[in-house]
Amino acid sequence: NNIKFYELTKALGCQFDIWQKGSDTDHHFPASQKLWELCDKAGDIYKKSYEGLYCVGCETFYEPEELNDSGECYEHPGKKLEVVKEENYFFRLSKYQSQIIHLITSGKLAITPESRKNEVLSFLKQPLMDISISRSNERAKNWGVPVPGDNTQRMYVWFDALNIYQSGVGFGWDDTRYNKWWPADVHVIGKG
C-alpha cells in the first residue's frame, strides 16, 4: 500500500519534503526513542508484569467484555485468543483523563464533526486504563523501534506510529526543521 500512496501523490501533482514509513531508522526511530525518553522522564512510563487475552491477528490484548459471545475478537472470529503473560512497559494514560476532557470541553482541542467529539467525550466518562506500549522482542519478532535502555523490548506499534507526524518534520533528528514546522496548524487524521 505504501507504494500506491506514493504514486497517488505524484498523480495528484503533490510534492513532499520527505517520504517516510514507520520502519525508517534514520528519522522515525530516533524520534520515537526521544518521545519515549521524554515520557519516561515525566514519570509516564512504568514496567509491570501483565497477563491477558491476546489476539495474534490484531497484536492486541483484550478485556473479556471487548470480545464476542464466543470469547473471540470481533475482527478474527473463529480464532482463539492466547492467554499471554509477559513483562511490558505501560503509559500512564489515566493520569491525563481530566486534562483531555478539559481540552475538549473548553474548545482548545477541536474535534469535528460534533458526533465524533461526543463519541470521544462519552468514552472518557469511563476511567481510562493505562496502556501497554511495548512488546517483548520475541512477540514483536524483533520488528519495530527498540525501547531505549532495554534490549528485550520493542515499542508497540501504536505508541510510535502516531509520532510519525512529528518525526517527519524533524522531531528527534533536526531541531531547526522541527521548530519551523511544529506545531502544525491543522492535523487531519483519517479513519477508515
Give the ranges of each region predicted by the language model.
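Glycine-centered flexibility sites
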Residues: 13, 43, 59, 144, ...
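Short secondary-structure capping/junction motifs at helix and strand boundaries
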Residues: 10-20, 41-52, 65-67, 83-84, ...
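N-terminal Rossmann-like or analogous alpha/beta NTP/dinucleotide-binding catalytic cores
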Residues: 1-45
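Short hydrophobic/aromatic-rich motifs at helix boundaries and adjacent loops
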Residues: 5-9, 70-73, 92-93, 173-176
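Cys/His-rich short segments
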Residues: 42-97, 101
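Structured secondary-structure scaffolds
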Residues: 20-22, 30-34, 77, 82-192
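Residue-level marker of positions within ordered structural domains that often coincide
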Residues: 10, 44, 60, 105, ...
